[in-house]
Structure formats: structure tokens, C-alpha cells
Amino acid sequence: MKRKETYLSRDFRETVALRFPAQAKELNTAFDMRLSALLAENADASKEKQYHLKRQILPGIAAYETLQRVMPKEEALQTVHGYVEQLARTSHKQLAALLHIPGLYRLVPGVFVKSTRSVFGPAAGFAPKELQTGNGIWRVDMMKCPYHDTCAEYGCPELCRCFCDSDDISYTGLHPKLIWERTMTLGRGNDRCDFCMKVR
């Protein structure tokens, strides 16, 4: 069964086709083999965690490692950061457009509460500590995160910052009456991620 292409694998293939055409076949094979190995090593993870592993974390690691065969480590990191950033900018545009619907912005903190509980909960490898979840405020400290843990486990903790940055790009300035705040992230070396989305 052919694996579904993620945005990261698609962008990786585009990079190697454009920049390294002579080695594209070899690089694509190396990427596919590494991703298959990573998926096999994490096959026993919960269904909830698999969602994050398959969609972003493992393709990110495979792309980052494979690109280092043909470019310096820092350039490989910036290249993968570019992939993640591009998706975050698209997501920001779509969300901001949706929030043009009058009054819809007021629902955003509540949506964050629900999605944290369903997609970013303990079953997926996160450890959220809810500080405030009502009256137009979503404030959560994330004490553990599979993006951070998996990147660190595979020796590339610096890669996690791509995913941290994507949150800031996606959620900053969505609407004049919504405030996104975060001063710390596990991926940037802090002991927690202090998330907050609130109605002004």
C-alpha cells in the first residue's frame, strides 16, 4: 500500500528535483527508506500520537537527515523550517479569512480548549496543564510534547523549533480582537510551552 504523501515529503521531493536533479532519485530513495524505518520504530505508538508522528514529526526528521547529505546542517534545518512555515502561512490566511465572519472570533479560545483535549492530550503524548479555559481565555502549560520528545530522541532537538514557530505564524494576528501569547516552548529550551489565546 502506497503511503500518503505529507506536505513535508512533497516539499522535500520538490527541493531535490529543483536543486539536486542528478541525485534526486537517490535522495528520494534515502528519504523513503529512512521514513519507513522511523515509522516501523514507532509502530506501537497510540493512534492519537501516530497522527502527529505520520503527518509532521517523522517526515520532518527524515527530510532533515536526508538533506544533510547534500547541504550543511544549518541549511537543511532552514529548508525544513521553510516547508513548515509555508504551511503555517497558508493556515493563517485561511483562519484569518474565516474570522471575517462577524463574532466568530469569540469562539476561538473555546475551539482551542476542545482541540487540546482531543488532539493534544495525554493519549497523543502531550501533558497539558489547564490554567484557564473559559470566559474567552484558553491558557495551558504544555509540560510534555511528542514533537520535542521525538526530535530529542532522534538527536535533532533543534528541529522542534520549526513546529514551535509554526504555531506563532499560524495564530499571531488572526483577528484584531484575538491575542495569541507564548513566551516559552520546550523546543526552544524552556521547561514548558505557555500557550494562551484570549479575546481582547
Question: What is each residue range found by the language model?
Answer:
Residues R55, T66-G155, L159:
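Amphipathic interaction/junction segments at domain boundaries or subunit interfaces
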Residues A24, E75, L178-I179:
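Secondary-structure boundary/capping signal
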Residues R3, F126-E130, W180:
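Generic structural motif
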Residues G136-D141, P146-T150, Y154-R200:
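C-terminal non-catalytic interaction appendages of large macromolecular assemblies
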